[in-house]
A protein has these predicted regions:
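Hydrophobic residues on short alpha-helical segments
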Residues: 17-18, 34
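Acidic-residue sensor for enzyme active/binding pockets
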Residues: 13, 46, 54
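DNA-binding patch around the recognition helix
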Residues: 8, 51-87
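Short coil-to-helix segment of the ABC ATPase nucleotide-binding domain corresponding to the Q-loop/switch region
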Residues: 25-37
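Short, positively charged loop/turn segments that connect secondary-structure elements
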Residues: 39-48
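A structural micro-motif at secondary-structure boundaries
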Residues: 2-15, 27, 43, 78-87
Length: 87
């Protein structure tokens, strides 16, 4: 549940969200998320990771122009620890 609403996530989205939410406020590297989602031998381009994060943001109602839930850093992504989001 997010903001008291049930949100349907794909398996990849749920895996990424769990990992990001595990360490709020800290960067999770792109490499770590790619390995977690697709395995060490996964030949996944960074663009596919970005696509999955965009989809996850959209489902969470996060504004891609000014994200407040999943932030982008140079090396990866950060889950913002925001109590008002209801997480």
């Amino acid at each position: 549940l997010f903001r008291s609403q049930r949100i349907l996530l794909s398996g990849l989205e749920a895996t990424m969200l769990r990992r990001l939410a595990k360490t709020p406020g800290r960067v999770v590297t792109k490499e770590e998320l790619i390995t977690l989602a697709w395995g060490k031998d996964g030949l996944i381009h960074e663009h596919e990771l970005q696509r999955q994060i965009e989809s996850l943001r959209r489902k969470l109602g996060d504004d891609p122009a000014e994200p407040r839930i999943i932030l982008t850093s140079l090396s990866g992504y950060v889950f913002a620890a925001v109590k008002e989001q209801g997480l």
